[in-house]
Amino acid sequence: MPLEPVSLDDKYDLRKSRIFVTGFQALVRLSLMQKERDRQAGLNTACYVTGYRGSPLGTLDQQFTRAGAVLAKNDIKFHPATNEELAATALSGSQQAELRGEGRFDGVFGMWYGKGPGVDRSGDAFRHANFSGTSRHGGVLALMGDDHTAESSTTAHQSEFHFVDVMIPILNPAGVQEIIDYGLYGWAMSRFTGAWTALKCMHETVESTAVVDGSLDRVKIVIPDDFAMPPGGLNIRLGDSVLGQEARLHDFKRDAMLAFVRVNRLNRVICTGGPAPKIGVITVGKSYLDVRQALDELGLDEVRCNDFGLRLYKIGCPWPISRQDLTDFAAGLDLVIVVEEKRSLIEVQVREELYGTANQPVCIGKKDEKGNWLFPVKGALDPNDIAICIGERLLGYVRNDDLAARVARLKEAQRALAETQDVAARVPYFCSGCPHNSSTVVPEGSRAYAGIGCHYMAQWMDRSTLGFTQMGGEGANWIGEAPFSKRPHVFQNLGDGTYNHSGSLAVRAAIHAGVNITYKILFNDAVAMTGGQHVDGNITVVQIANEMAAEGATRVVVVTDEPWKYPTGTKWPAGLKIHHRDDLQEVQ
């Protein structure tokens, strides 16, 4: 049998259905698929993609840039933003393109991307955008790049609760295939409900590679026919009142979300539990894959799950979840186990919706039946721990020597793992030749604050550097500390990317507060930590120097390996001096 011909171009060739892609590439293909599906439906739409680069969505912008030629042919505009909340605001504008009769297309569907801190800082923009709504043939997907174990962030992030707070429904894919599937459902739901749709993009998902079905007709969107639209519909409108937007969101849009999720079966039973189900497992996204691995470790396929009375429910939309879906799932069960990483989003809805129902089952998740930690909020979940939890409770209903032996082996393996010492720990360091390697050194007796970027690593080195803030807050902490400290002065490291993103406001605030602080703006013209991309806007050393002088900085100097590279006549601010990097300590 001859091998199927494969090309690197297949991933964006919509004539090919079976494709080999990463999660990032799947998101690029997703935009192409939506455009073509609209075309086949008789719509002339465009797409607007914007956001701020950052891991775990760290190379998404590169994938969109590389696909620029094919995207341009399909009216898909990729436009990196200065920061996340401005990207969200721009996407809100994309939904207004047809409102005044000035639109060039039938609609613009949008995609926002950012990591957890970007979701944090965009809350107000999300709230305003979701209140005003989406266009009928537009819709917006918000990709939240969550980092549950803080592998590339200053904090461990779980962004779902931010979207719940602004009432944006959430889809949580388990694998690359569902990135495409849920993306298409997400845009359709956004159009139907008039609300944005969030798509959770953990690095375990988007950084995976898989062979997927990229057929244009794979996903069959069903529009609910039992939902009564209010007068004027749910989409964005001109002259809308604030209280009218609020009322529509609470009175109609949430119900529209539930109707869409239910009719499209985004939450579905995987194993019924056979004729006499006793235990039900509810899970979502990456945790669903962990549960499937746990069941494999226990030797439980669908047949044995049904034999043992184990029902499995896969959630695609963790918020909102309908009462009817949960009561249907829980019917006849004695125990419900909710498996989800970080804080409990699904478990609290299960408890709320099942409370007071007939034959209400016991519900465990974060804590067990006795109130002890079961699946802790911190860190990530381990499939072996999930397997032990499920296996032990199944053994309370069935006697099976093989299952008991498997649970015992897993317990022993976890005990051995807990006793294993980490003997190969290595502290990250700057790349060879990186200017940060010398720029972050401070004079003896001085101290510095770190910030967001590679120079965060200076805290792990012998550089008297300790402490950091959120992105864009660098140095503002000294405004509050300085009046109460014996120390007269500190240094603050600030990357050029962060300066452009929002850090310039912190410098302005420090100047206005009159505190004694030296900002070391570490310029290397690259977002080195997330792919080496150029800083958006192509800012220059000359531009930054003039901005700092205009803000009122007492003294501005430039330290460089190549003082001679700036030609005579360069428009520096008055009094600026240029020094060689060898003189850094003297300058400081």
Residue ranges: model-predicted function:
Residues 333, 445-446, 553:
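Short, well-ordered alpha-helix to beta-strand connector turns
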Residues 1-176, 202-204, 273-275, 282, ...:
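Thiamine diphosphate
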Residues 59-65, 90-93, 121-125, 150-159, ...:
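Short acidic, glycine/serine/threonine-rich loops at helix termini
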Residues 69-82, 131-143, 221-234, 514-522, ...:
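A glycine-rich helix N-cap at a beta->alpha junction
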Residues 146-196, 202, 228-241, 488, ...:
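Conserved thiamine diphosphate
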Residues 49-51, 142-144, 313, 338-340, ...:
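Short internal beta-strands
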Residues 1-30, 34, 173-430, 435, ...:
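Flexible, low-complexity linker and terminal segments
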Residues 134, 145, 459-463, 476, ...:
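Catalytic or ion-translocation cores adjacent to nucleophile or general acid/base/metal-coordination motifs
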